[in-house]
Amino acid sequence: MIAFLFYKCFAKNYKINFLYKNSSYINTNTLWLKVIYIKTKDVIIFLLLFFVAFNVSSAYVIKNLNIDCIVTPDDTINETISFVIYNNEDKNLSHISYTIPQTIRNFTINASAGVKGYSALYNEGVTEIAIEFEKPIPKGGYTNITINCFVNDAIWTKNGIKQLILSFPITSKNATIKIVLPPGAVILSPQGTLLVTPSGYKITTDGKHQIIVWDLSLNKEITFTITVKYTFISYPGQNIIEQPAINNNLKYLLIIAIFGTAIFGGLFVKEKISKRKIIERTKNIKNELTSLKNKLKEKEEEIKNLAIKIKDLEDKLSKANKNLLNKDEIISVLNERISEYESQIQKLLDENIIYKEKIESLNKYIETLKKENDKLKDKVRELSDIAKKYMEEKRGVLWSFLTEDEKIIIDLIKKHGHITQKEIVEITGMSKPKVSRIISELEDRKIIRKEKIGRINKLTLTEESKKLL
């Protein structure tokens, strides 16, 4: 029936090959499937027939959904989806369908009830999987299902930053989703905020990978979309992977040291920037205060000039009273002018008061900024002391992981700055093979390097080890 429906719906456009356990071509439960891209009209016809044939959405319940996504350095995702199907109908359950919102490849399906056959339908980045059980699930029974597949269209790269986007339909009340990033990958966190959505996650590590986990408890069906932005970091000794435990510890201590330096450096720079902003604001306020003082001086000059004009007018009025017969009329005109000037003077006086209040307010604000500046200076000094103390402690980390012979050779290199392997053999009395082996190990761990001086290769410390020794 299933094969007939698929054939009737898609015979004109493509072919689906079903292989069952009793087929003469295979002797396993695996069904091989050709990738199919479907026209819109045929999709509608197929879905109608598909849901008639597989109308079991209410016939079973999905529980205990677990999705593990392991991201590889080549941007491929190894995805494992496991869940339990419960049959809550009065009849046996022989087949189900499951949707994965990605284009998957190289997939396998296993079930505790056995898999008689399965098919996959691809359409615009979505894979619809139909599974037929070898042993139908009886009423009230259940089966465990595991789908393993590879996804290579869920990660985008721009300017060295990778963005992962995955969506999952969640019908189970309880679900766990785990994203395992590649070795050396770190989640971006500008301004201290991790670029991971949605919230509610927790981050763990197994020593090599950052792992993001969501434990979901839901009361309805949802589509759960995950986005993660990450990048890769490099560090000294990165190529030392399969080394003794002491070298692994050294690698992790170096990573911790680098991150610690970056954090303290970031805090120090942040405090410096904050201090610079306060200084700039103080400078702007001082400039504004100077401008207000200049305006106040101009207003005082205007008041002084107006007072002189008033005095001149009063003199003219006095003369007019003596010389003119219509002195009353002239006095009236002059009085009006005097009133206008007095009004202007009063207005200027009011403005003068306002400017004085602003100056007083700005002076108080300057005092506040000075106090904040002093606090920031104290904080910068405190952070500088912490950073110095941290760097002093860090310098002893690498030394504690060296053998006595390695310490002797490194002391000679530190003392002479540059030294040949032959000189080390002569000074220490060690055998040439032993010295050669120790130097080779120190070079592999990026602690020393060879530098050609003239025609002779001499040994010297690397820049990174100089900071740590």
Curated annotation (Swiss-Prot):
Q: Which organism is it from?
A: Methanocaldococcus jannaschii (strain ATCC 43067 / DSM 2661 / JAL-1 / JCM 10045 / NBRC 100440)
Question: Looking at the keywords, is Transmembrane helix present?
Answer: yes
Q: Does the keyword ATP-binding apply?
A: no
Q: Name the InterPro entries for this protein.
A: ArsR-like_HTH (IPR011991), DUF7343 (IPR055767), WH-like_DNA-bd_sf (IPR036388), WH_DNA-bd_sf (IPR036390)
Transmembrane stretches, start-end? 42-62, 179-199, 249-269
Specify the signal sequence span: none
Q: What is this protein called?
A: Uncharacterized protein MJ1254
Topology with regard to the membrane? Multi-pass membrane protein
UniProt keyword list: Cell membrane, Membrane, Transmembrane, Transmembrane helix
GO CC annotation terms, alphabetical:
plasma membrane
Q: In terms of one coarse class, where is the protein primarily found?
A: membrane
Q: Which Pfam families match?
A: DUF7343
Q: Which residues form a coiled coil?
A: none
Report the locations given in the UniProt record. Answer: Cell membrane
